[in-house]
């Protein structure tokens, strides 16, 4: 498959690690680079992890600690054997003159490595994210070169990552003086209440869109219409009594799980206190 047909999907933990490495950089370092880890399947490069590679850039050369990069990769393979090298990342919003030299090294580590740039300056209040592949240019028997060509990049996340991002959003807009250092997970019933409230607001938004389309206030979108039709067909057909019975049964199961978890927590706390009691 051609490198130009690749699509890059980046997980949130990768961006967090890039920002953390940028914040911990040396005072004389203007750019931070590192290795991207993940997998490639059917033209999709999924980046699930990364690590920083110490380096120094001079006017005419680049010095990178390649032995450190190999050691970090070997350690990561022991934890997650499914992750392999898929490219490299760098902070900044542009490709520099040294990028081709660094990319040449990663081209020996994997096929069609991708180059990810993360703009940590937050210009415009957003973190710029771009992905590139290097295309070889030249004529047979003549001079050759390479050109970094942009490819599509998008953010994706697993369900636990989405849940963590929602917890982080609770601290957005809070002043640093009043910002909590920890955000504990909500109780199960509180999660159900919040999810129900959000579901209700989304349903109201859908109803408003449908009413506006019927009243010819909004131009209908066929893609949205197909998604709404699929959503309606996915709803199980049952009577109100059947739904109430099923809902009450699930609530009883949830309450039983909460009760048992609280009992186990109390037993563990009691066992901890008994362990530290002085013996006669």
Swiss-Prot record:
It holds the Pfam family MitMem_reg. One of its GO terms (molecular function) is metal-dependent deubiquitinase activity. GO terms for cellular component: eukaryotic 43S preinitiation complex; eukaryotic 48S preinitiation complex; eukaryotic translation initiation factor 3 complex, eIF3m. The keyword Acyltransferase does not apply. Its main location: cytoplasm. InterPro entries: eIF3f (IPR027531), EIF3F/CSN6-like_C (IPR024969), JAMM/MPN+_dom (IPR000555), MPN (IPR037518). Belongs to the eIF-3 subunit F family. PANTHER family: EUKARYOTIC TRANSLATION INITIATION FACTOR 3 SUBUNIT F, EUKARYOTIC TRANSLATION INITIATION FACTOR 3 SUBUNIT F-RELATED. Component of the eukaryotic translation initiation factor 3 (eIF-3) complex, which is involved in protein synthesis of a specialized repertoire of mRNAs and, together with other initiation factors, stimulates binding of mRNA and methionyl-tRNAi to the 40S ribosome. The eIF-3 complex specifically targets and initiates translation of a subset of mRNAs involved in cell proliferation. HAMAP family: eIF3f (MF_03005). This is Eukaryotic translation initiation factor 3 subunit F-1.
């Amino acid at each position: 498959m051609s490198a130009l047909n690749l699509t890059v999907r980046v997980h949130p933990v990768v961006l967090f690690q890039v920002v953390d490495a940028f914040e911990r950089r040396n005072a004389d370092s203007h750019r931070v680079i590192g290795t991207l880890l993940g997998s490639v399947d059917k033209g999709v490069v999924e980046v699930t992890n990364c690590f920083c590679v110490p380096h120094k850039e001079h006017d005419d050369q680049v010095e990178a600690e390649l032995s450190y990069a190999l050691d970090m990769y070997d350690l990561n393979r022991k934890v997650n054997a499914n992750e392999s090298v898929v490219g490299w990342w760098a902070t900044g919003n542009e490709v520099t003159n040294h990028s081709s030299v660094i990319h040449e090294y990663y081209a020996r580590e994997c096929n069609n490595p991708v180059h990810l740039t993360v703009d940590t300056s937050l210009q415009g209040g957003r973190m710029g994210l771009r992905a590139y592949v290097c295309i070889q240019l030249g004529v047979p028997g003549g001079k050759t070169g390479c050109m970094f060509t942009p490819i599509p990049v998008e953010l994706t996340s697993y369900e636990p990552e989405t849940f963590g991002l929602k917890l982080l959003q609770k601290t957005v807009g809070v002043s640093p003086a009043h910002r909590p250092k920890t955000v504990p997970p909500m109780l199960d019933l509180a999660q159900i209440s919040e999810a129900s409230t959000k579901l209700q607001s989304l349903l109201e938004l859908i109803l408003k869109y449908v009413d506006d389309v019927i009243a010819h206030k909004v131009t209908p979108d066929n893609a949205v219409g197909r998604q709404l039709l699929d959503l309606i067909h996915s709803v199980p057909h049952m009577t109100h009594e059947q739904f109430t019975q099923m809902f009450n049964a699930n609530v009883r199961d949830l309450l039983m799980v909460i009760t048992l978890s609280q009992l186990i927590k109390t037993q563990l706390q009691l066992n901890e206190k008994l362990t530290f009691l002085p013996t006669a």
